C-alpha cells in the first residue's frame, strides 16, 4: 500500500511540475515574441554635392514599427585638387570631415507584409576640425524584412547643418540592420 501511495503522490507532483513548466514556458515565449527588437544599423551613401556618409546606429523598435534611433555619423566631402585638377587621395580624405552623435524618432507611415516605411526626424551634435556642428535631420526610410530578423533599407535624407561648411546635405543611403538579442 505504501508503494502505491508513493507512486500516486509522485505522479501527482510530476503532473503539477509539468503544468507549472508549461505555463512558465508559454508565458515567457509569448513575452519574447514581439516587435520590440533592438537592431544594429550600418548604412552608407552619397550626398549632394560631393559628399559621402557613413552611419552606425542602434535602433529600438516600439509599437507598430515606430522606432527610436541613436546614431553616430561620419561625413566626408571631397574636392578637386588645385595642383592636378582632379580628385586625388589628399583632396579626397583631407578636404572637409565631420562627425556627429544624435537621436531620431521614426514614426511608421507605410506598412506592408514584409516592409515598412518611416519618417525620420532627429537632431545631432558633433564637430568638424574647427568647431561644433549641429544638425537637424529629416527624411524617409524604407525597410525590407529578410530571414532571421535581418533587414535591408534605403533612406532619403536631408540634413540642415548649423555651424559647418555645408548648410544643406541631401542624398541617398543604403544599408543593413542586424538583430541584437
Residue spans of the language-model regions?
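A periodicity- and composition-biased signal for non-globular, repetitive helical segments
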Residues: 8, 16, 21-22, 66, ...
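Gram-negative (and chloroplast) outer-membrane scaffold detector with strong preference
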Residues: 59-152, 178-181
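Small/flexible residues
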Residues: 12, 17-18, 41, 62, ...
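Short glycine/proline- and aromatic-enriched beta-strand/turn motifs that initiate or cap beta-hairpins
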Residues: 31-78, 171, 177-181
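Compositionally biased, low-complexity repeat tracts
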Residues: 27, 34, 39-41, 96-98, ...
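Cleavable N-terminal export/targeting peptides
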Residues: 1-37, 180-181
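Internal, hydrophobic beta-strand segments that form the core of beta-sheet-rich folds
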Residues: 155-156
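Solvent-exposed loop/turn segments connecting transmembrane beta-strands
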Residues: 42-55, 93-97, 125-136, 160-169
